């Protein structure tokens, strides 16, 4: 590094000395700006630096050096404890680390964003309307607030808890998830629920009825649902095979047709025994102890449970008019499709069936 010459250093010192001398001898046109009176501090209001920026006399607030070492101004940006300050301190409406009101950072303010216990704070604390991990009202995080989104027990909360109108895993009212709420969509036993349960006006499959008529948990419901799926897959496979060999069965003798129908219906009724009987249900219902070739009509009427406007499969003496074919000439109600024990109201063009239809 090249050093300065003695001439350059002497010139700098001379200029500095002349500047100080001339500054002391200059006549100022504005006495308010050049005097040591109180008005010198007016220009220090709202400053950006290390002084309070408050209009005070030197006697009231001390000298300038003492005030510069402190950091307590109003609306100051830096290090201190001001009001509406951005930095490190404990101000009001401050952004940084402190305990202010409406502060953004790590503290316990009101309407603060960070870590603390404020009101309407975003972060970790126990505020009102806070977003983070705490116990506020209308908070988003992990806590027990009202109208909170997270894991807790609030009202109208979205997460894992037991609130009212909650979306998640719990037992709330009007909840969407796995629980037992009212108007719930999922797995549970609610009212007006869409899923797998025992509700009123439910769309789905009923769970297996127990002896104590108790509610089943999600694990049991899952197993029941898997069994129902297997039954449906088996029935679909059987239907596909029957459709593939439909021409052969129609060309075969009526005796062979009766055997095929008997085997199919026996499997169908065994699968029905594990299903339930809801109200106004659309689908298939079980008929406990149902016999296909019952000659006694009273036995059939005693076995079948009385249901109101239920669309199901199986014969029912006390039911609404059904459209189909029956070998035992009993009435089924308003059912469109195939039934066990022979397809009724179908068009079987075998000679024996044509003669039977004409004799009727």
Curated annotation (Swiss-Prot):
**This protein's GO CC annotations:** extracellular region
Query: Which tissues show it?
Result: Expressed in 57 cells including a cardiorespiratory cell and the visceral white interneuron (VWI).
Superkingdom is: Eukaryota
Q: What is the lineage of its organism?
A: Eukaryota, Metazoa, Spiralia, Lophotrochozoa, Mollusca
What InterPro entries does the database record attribute to this sequence?
FMRFamid-related_peptide-like (IPR002544), FMRFamide-related_np (IPR051041), Serralysin-like_metalloprot_C (IPR011049)
Protein's job: SDPFLRF-amide inhibits neurons. SKPYMRF-amide excites neurons.
Organism (species): Lymnaea stagnalis
Q: What is this protein called?
A: FMRFamide-related neuropeptides
- Give TM regions: none
Which residue positions does Tyrosine amide occur at? 323
Propeptide regions on this chain: 36-43, 49-70, 106, 205-275, 284-317, 327-330, 338-360
Compartment(s) of residence: Secreted
Skewed-composition ranges (Basic and acidic residues): 227-252, 259-272, 325-335
Q: Keywords in UniProt for this one? A: Amidation, Cleavage on pair of basic residues, Neuropeptide, Repeat, Secreted, Signal
PANTHER family associated with the record: FMRFAMIDE-RELATED PEPTIDES
Residues making up the signal peptide according to the UniProt record: 1-35
Q: Where is this region: Disordered?
A: 227-272, 312-360
**What are the GO BP annotations of this UniProt entry?**
neuropeptide signaling pathway
Residue numbers bearing the Phenylalanine amide modification: 77, 86, 95, 104, 113, 122, 131, 140, 149, 158, 167, 176, 185, 194, 203, 282, 336
Q: Which family does it belong to?
A: Belongs to the FARP (FMRFamide related peptide) family.
């Amino acid at each position: 590094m090249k050093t300065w010459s003695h001439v350059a250093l002497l010139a700098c010192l001379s200029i500095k000395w002349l500047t100080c001398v001339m500054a002391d001898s200059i006549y100022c046109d504005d006495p308010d700006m050049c005097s040591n009176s109180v008005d010198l501090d007016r220009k220090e209001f709202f400053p950006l630096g290390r002084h309070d920026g408050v209009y005070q006399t030197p006697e009231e607030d001390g000298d300038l050096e003492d005030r510069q070492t402190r950091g307590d101004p109003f609306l100051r940006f830096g290090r201190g404890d001001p009001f509406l300050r951005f930095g490190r301190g404990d101000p009001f409406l401050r952004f940084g680390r402190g305990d202010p009101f409406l502060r953004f950072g790590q503290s316990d303010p009101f309407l603060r964003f960070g870590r603390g216990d404020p009101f309407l704070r975003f972060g970790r604390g126990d505020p009102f309307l806070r977003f983070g991990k705490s116990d506020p009202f209308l908070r988003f995080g992990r806590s027990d607030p009202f109208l909170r989104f997270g894991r807790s027990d609030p009202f109208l909360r979205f997460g894992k808890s037991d609130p009212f109108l909650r979306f998640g895993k719990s037992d709330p009212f009007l909840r969407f998830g796995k629980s037992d709420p009212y108007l719930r969509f999922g797995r549970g036993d609610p009212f007006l629920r869409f899923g797998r349960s025992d509700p009123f006006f439910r769309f789905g499959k009923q769970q297996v009825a127990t002896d104590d008529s108790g509610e089943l948990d999600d694990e049991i419901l899952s197993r029941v649902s898997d069994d129902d799926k297997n039954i449906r897959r088996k029935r679909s496979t059987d239907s596909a095979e029957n459709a593939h060999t439909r021409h052969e069965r129609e060309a075969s003798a009526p005796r062979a047709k009766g055997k095929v129908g008997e085997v199919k219906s026996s499997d169908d009724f065994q699968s029905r025994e594990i299903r339930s009987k809801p109200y106004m249900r659309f689908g298939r219902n079980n008929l406990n102890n149902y016999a296909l070739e019952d000659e006694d009509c009273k036995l059939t009427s005693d076995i079948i449970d009385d249901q109101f406007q239920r669309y199901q499969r199986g014969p029912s003496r006390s039911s609404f008019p059904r459209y189909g074919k029956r070998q035992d000439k009993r009435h089924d109600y308003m059912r469109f499709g195939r039934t066990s024990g022979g397809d009724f109201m179908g068009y079987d063009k075998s000679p024996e069936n044509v003669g039977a239809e004409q004799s009727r």
